[in-house]
């Protein structure tokens, strides 16, 4: 129950219930599905009132992409919490980026929604946040999917790569080859490249979640 989980008072719970019903009707989603998405946001740590504001966006995205509502909610929370993409307008832009990237490539948004919570945490830990971080993740997954052949392998390869960044053994390996790893990374970033050192900064156009 959202009212209990989110510590809502009577009138607040009534207002939230009305918001969820309107979101369900306007997005062609069932009331239970919308409630599940908002409940997931609250369970992840978002305030109930704030989570309710995203009910319509969750519904529109689920309808447009056929992604699982629970996965979408976890994805949305990770975008907000890990990458610090805050507010409905910015989250809508982020979801549009993800949908557009999925449409262009082979890595569908349904699979992306399942993997993003882990990947956003890894990128955030490296100080890579915001819409640019999401663009890097999407591009990496799409290229990785084409190279590996499966969604799972693409995610695993990216996780392994991110986990190895800045490790002592990585830095030492570059030093043995006569390369200052940290300085090289800083130079690439200064020239407009991502911390992954392979992806130039690019911003895909918006998609059409609604």
Locations of regions flagged by a protein language model:
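A short, structural motif
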Residues: 1-74, 81-93, 102-113, 126-131, ...
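Alpha-helical scaffold elements adjacent to nucleotide-binding pockets in ATP/GTP-utilizing enzyme cores
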Residues: 75, 94-97, 136, 157
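Extended amphipathic alpha-helical segments with heptad-repeat/coiled-coil character used for oligomerization
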Residues: 107-115, 125-199
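Cationic, amphipathic, low-complexity alpha-helical segments enriched
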Residues: 195-209
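A short, terminal or domain-edge coil/loop segment
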Residues: 84-88, 122-127, 164-170, 207-210
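Amphipathic alpha-helical scaffolding segments
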Residues: 57, 77-78, 159-162
